[in-house]
Every structure is written in structure tokens, then in C-alpha cells.
């Protein structure tokens, strides 16, 4: 059963990179109605996939699922619960995933709280944010286990 959560973590992380790679393409769309729908789907999908990724990693740390290499290297069965939770971002992979989660939450709030008068500015801001987050996700995938 616990192997499923490690797979969920990896699948949603891959989904996040897929969405981030296509997000800038959505921003270049000429039709405003299509553009706003695609950006809405992208921003929500990114937030959900990042949240699921981070919390599934947190779950496998809490239940001490040692089939996940990150848990095997950075956890112990006798650790108190608080240390297991804080141990999620106490290593390279977890801290990078937390940073990606913070970036996607920031991206979501930019999208939700923007002023309609500056939609071009917000679109460019979201596009730039997507490029930055894509870089972090690629770095995490390529340098982490």
C-alpha cells in the first residue's frame, strides 16, 4: 500500500513539470477567452499537483515507508512525529519540493488576486514565474533521486 504513495509523489511531480513546460505556450495564445481558460486550468493544476506531491512525500515520511529512498536516507522509525514532518524539507529533495510548492502557491495568488485592468502584466508575470518554476523542477528532477 505504501508503495502507491511514493508512485503518486513521482507521478504528480512529473505532471507538474509537464504543465509548467506548456504554461508559457498558453500565455502566447492570441484568443483572450481561450488564453484565460488555459491559464486557469494550468495554475490550478500546478497548485494541485505540487500540493499532492509535497504532501505525499510528507505522508511517506510520517508512516516511515522505507521503500522510498528519500525516507530511507533521512528518517528513522523512532523519530518523534514533529521531527518526521520537519525532516521532509530537511534534505535536498524535500527542500526543493517545498520551494517549488511555495512558488506555485505564489503563482496561484498572483493569478487569483490580479486586477483585470493589468491582464497583460499579470500574464507576463505568470509566464516568467512559470519559467522560474520550470527551472527549479528540472533541477530537482535531474539532481535528485
State the predicted function of each range:
Residues 1-145:
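Polytopic transmembrane helical bundles with strong interfacial aromatic enrichment
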Amino acid at each position: 500500500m505504501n508503495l502507491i504513495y511514493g508512485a503518486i509523489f513521482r507521478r504528480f511531480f512529473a505532471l507538474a513539470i509537464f504543465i509548467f513546460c506548456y504554461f508559457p505556450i498558453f500565455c502566447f495564445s492570441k484568443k483572450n477567452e481561450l488564453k484565460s481558460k488555459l491559464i486557469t486550468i494550468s495554475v490550478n493544476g500546478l497548485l494541485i499537483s505540487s500540493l499532492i506531491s509535497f504532501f505525499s512525500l510528507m505522508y511517506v515520511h510520517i508512516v516511515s515507508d522505507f521503500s522510498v529512498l528519500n525516507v530511507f536516507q533521512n528518517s528513522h522509525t523512532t523519530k518523534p512525529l514533529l521531527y518526521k514532518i520537519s525532516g521532509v524539507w530537511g534534505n535536498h529533495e524535500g527542500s526543493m519540493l517545498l520551494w517549488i510548492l511555495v512558488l506555485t502557491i505564489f503563482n496561484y495568488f498572483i493569478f487569483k488576486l490580479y486586477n483585470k485592468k493589468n491582464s497583460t502584466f499579470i500574464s507576463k508575470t505568470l509566464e516568467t514565474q512559470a519559467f522560474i518554476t520550470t527551472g527549479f523542477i528540472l533541477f530537482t528532477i535531474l539532481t535528485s533521486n
